[in-house]
């Protein structure tokens, strides 16, 4: 009975997968489409009203300069701006520019009528966001009014900001254009990332030493000693730091350690390097509505992977088509304009 049930379940799952699979005949790849842009930032503050105009200009630059966005075919292109801000992000002095996401929805036309509007294929990139373009930032808790001492609110938040401001950086591959750096997640993986920046400014990311990380870990854990577990973690941290040599403490920090589990870093160049965003990168003589850095997901599937994607989905991998049509040199040069005014 169990074997029969398992067989029936497998047949049902296979049928569902086949039913959900898409084929090219489901779409109208040659039907002309249209471009639209909308702003999802709802704040009525003056800086956001000004910023919305800057981002609209940027969106229009993409519309005018990327062929598949200028003359959509097989889909309507719905571009949307999404804001992203929170009080802890703004507390960090390395975060100056207002951050935003610009999303492109490829609303494919169905051969049976209508178009794909709910979670269609899409691509997005980030503007002025220091938490993108690299590995994920940590998520150490900030002050909790239900658990923490009110007198420690400022100290706890400052310690958490420092802890959460350190991130692992993917391997640098090359500079594809002045002001455009390419990183890859792994040597055998297609996900890549681009950072578009002003090369006349100081480095956007700066390394941290093992000692710096040891100090900010101590600052954080010494503020959290209410429970026995908190005290055990602090004691373990102090033990781990004592086991590090002076040479390793002064070395650049890399992610991972064979034995330590609180201060999980090493100075032996093993793993991804740890860095933080450089506060000096920002040109603070400009308003915080200016565009000073952008980060892009940059997929580069090989032909076999692209063919498999097309077979499984019935449509091209639009993200890769899009990034391969962007004029990266021109985009980097326009970075110096900051407001992307359209001439």
Kindly label every feature range from the protein language model:
Residues 11, 15, 158, 185, ...:
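Functionally constrained cores in energy, signaling, and assembly domains
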Residues 1-22:
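Bacterial Sec-dependent N-terminal signal peptides
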Residues 31, 35-37, 330:
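Residue-level detector of beta-propeller blades
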Residues 36-283:
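Short, solvent-exposed recognition patches
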Residues 22-31:
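Cleaved targeting-peptide boundary
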Residues 303-343:
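Surface-exposed amphipathic alpha-helical segments
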Residues 121-134, 138-140, 284-313:
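Intrinsically disordered, low-complexity regulatory segments enriched in Ser/Thr/Pro
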């Amino acid at each position: 009975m169990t074997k029969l049930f398992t067989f029936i379940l497998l047949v049902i799952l296979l049928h569902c997968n086949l039913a959900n699979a898409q084929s090219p005949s489901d779409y109208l790849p040659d039907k002309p489409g249209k471009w639209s842009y909308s702003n999802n930032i709802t704040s009525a503050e003056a800086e956001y009203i000004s910023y919305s105009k800057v981002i609209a200009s940027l969106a229009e630059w993409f519309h005018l300069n990327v062929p598949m966005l200028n003359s959509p075919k097989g889909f309507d292109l719905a571009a949307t701006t999404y804001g992203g801000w929170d009080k802890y992000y703004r507390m960090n002095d390395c975060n100056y520019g207002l951050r935003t996401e610009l999303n492109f929805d490829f609303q494919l036309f169905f051969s049976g009528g209508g178009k794909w509007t709910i979670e269609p294929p899409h691509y997005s990139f980030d503007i002025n966001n220091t938490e993108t373009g690299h590995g994920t930032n940590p998520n150490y808790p900030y002050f909790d009014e239900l658990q923490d001492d009110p007198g420690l609110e400022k100290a706890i938040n400052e310690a958490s900001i420092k802890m959460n401001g350190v991130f692992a950086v993917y391997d640098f591959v090359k500079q594809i254009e002045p002001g455009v750096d390419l990183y890859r997640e792994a040597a055998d993986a297609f996900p890549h990332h681009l950072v578009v920046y002003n090369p006349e400014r100081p480095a956007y990311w700066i390394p941290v030493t093992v000692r710096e990380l040891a100090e900010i870990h101590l600052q954080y854990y010494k503020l959290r000693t209410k429970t026995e577990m908190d005290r055990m973690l602090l004691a373990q941290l102090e033990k781990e730091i004592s086991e590090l040599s002076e040479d390793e403490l002064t070395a650049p920090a890399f992610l991972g350690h064979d034995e330590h589990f609180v201060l999980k870093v090493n100075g032996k160049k093993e793993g991804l390097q740890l860095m933080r965003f450089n506060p000096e990168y920002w040109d603070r003589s400009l308003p915080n509505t200016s565009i000073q850095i952008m980060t892009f997901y940059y997929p580069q599937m090989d032909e076999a992977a692209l063919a498999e994607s097309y077979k499984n989905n019935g449509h091209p991998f639009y993200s890769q088509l899009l990034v391969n049509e962007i004029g990266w040199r021109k985009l980097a040069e326009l970075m110096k304009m900051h407001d992307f005014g359209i001439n």
